């Protein structure tokens, strides 16, 4: 039996991560421990044991996590949240000294991968496609850059170099909302006008560094990837429907260009185990990089249905049981989310 600890078990992808571990191709029995900063985290009803932990920024976080690992005889830790990666990757050796593997890339690789600006610079240096961009540090620089990218005739993207999920992302579009859209569409909170964004940014005592980039009108892709001692592979999927940053409808599309970009960039960064990259097509159908997620992605469970369980590959690699042959990846695969829930009566949980 393998004892697995998953962090951030209140994250939207928790059920998928557990599914990938429980439905591993080696038929290994697994015992899953979950931790989260939120005592109400929904994942507590999906794991065998649950613990509340301090925030990753808390100096006590690592020691609390280690104590839980020792108590539960944990074999491997799987970090799920971006904000935890820094603290956990800094302490890989600390866990290793206590006989615990951590499925995370080295600290330096994590710091590079989590920085969207550094990813853009990396792709530029490697000669791989990336959106045209400009770094701005003031209102005047923001206004000039946005206009240079074609606003208001063209939409423009603004985002901070380091953020989690869709935090800080805005698409600048002239007349972003009118009465017709107001009455017919649900608000997304992403689209604003330039003046609306400036109004927000003026309500503070500092101006954050921001990336202004061209808007890519085509399909968005997420690539689930694995890099181990002997093998590496990548599985692109089209994100046909995205709700609040979460993939609800996915279709596997094994595009060789995105596979090559992902594996080439990940080698340069020094990524290990499982991780993801996101791309979007420009007006000519060329995939350009958006960001890297150096961790388990929220919909990485889709890979299970291709015959290439990316998460389990990472677990085996972390435990010193590397795969020697690449899996046979099926291409005619879709993955769709549906709303579900958990009812809790007198402490007993039942899924619907």
Regions found by a protein language model. Give the residues of each.
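Residues that mark the start of a beta-strand
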Residues: 1-5, 155, 211
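ATP-binding N-terminal substructure of ATP-dependent carboxylate-amine bond-forming enzymes
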Residues: 1-104
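Active-site nucleotide/adenylate-binding loops and adjacent lid/helix of ATP-dependent enzymes
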Residues: 110-209
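A short catalytic or substrate-binding loop motif that flags glycine-/basic-rich loops and adjacent residues
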Residues: 162-163, 215-219, 270-272
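ATP-dependent carboxylate activation and anion-phosphoryl transfer catalytic cores
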Residues: 2, 8, 72, 241-244, ...
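Phosphate-binding site of ATP-dependent enzymes
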Residues: 183-245, 252-263, 280-288
């Amino acid at each position: 039996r393998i004892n697995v600890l998953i962090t951030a078990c209140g994250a939207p992808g928790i059920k998928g991560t557990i599914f990938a571990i429980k439905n591993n191709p080696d038929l290994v029995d697994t015992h899953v421990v979950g931790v989260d900063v939120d005592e109400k985290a929904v994942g507590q009803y999906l794991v065998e044991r649950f613990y509340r932990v301090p925030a990753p920024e808390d100096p006590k976080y690592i020691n609390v996590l280690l104590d839980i690992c020792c108590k539960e005889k944990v074999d491997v830790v799987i970090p799920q949240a971006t904000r935890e990666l820094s603290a956990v990757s800094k302490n890989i050796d600390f866990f290793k000294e206590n006989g615990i593997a951590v499925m995370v890339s080295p600290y330096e690789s994590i710091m590079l991968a989590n920085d969207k600006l550094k990813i853009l610079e990396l792709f530029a240096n490697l000669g791989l496609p990336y959106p045209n961009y400009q770094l701005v540090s003031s209102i005047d620089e923001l206004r000039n850059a946005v206009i240079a990218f074609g606003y208001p005739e063209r939409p423009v993207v603004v985002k901070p170099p380091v953020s989690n999920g869709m935090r800080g992302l805005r698409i600048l579009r002239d007349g972003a909302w009118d009465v017709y859209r107001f009455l017919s569409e649900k608000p997304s909170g992403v689209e604003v006008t330039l003046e609306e964004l400036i109004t927000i940014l003026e309500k503070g005592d500092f101006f954050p560094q921001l990336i202004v980039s061209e808007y890519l009108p085509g399909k968005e892709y997420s690539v689930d990837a694995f890099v181990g001692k002997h093998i590496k592979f990548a599985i692109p999927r089209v994100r046909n429907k995205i709700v609040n940053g979460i993939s609800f409808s996915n279709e596997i599309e094994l595009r060789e260009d995105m596979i090559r970009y992902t594996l080439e960039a990940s080698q340069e960064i020094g990524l290990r185990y499982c991780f993801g990259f996101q791309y979007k097509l420009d007006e000519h159908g060329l995939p350009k990089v958006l960001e890297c997620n150096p961790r388990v992605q929220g919909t990485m469970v889709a890979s299970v249905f291709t015959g290439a369980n990316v998460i389990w590959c990472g677990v085996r690699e972390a435990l010193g049981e590397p795969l020697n042959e690449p899996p046979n990846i099926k291409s005619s695969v879709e993955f769709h989310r549906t709303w579900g829930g958990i009812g809790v009566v007198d402490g007993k949980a039942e899924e619907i």
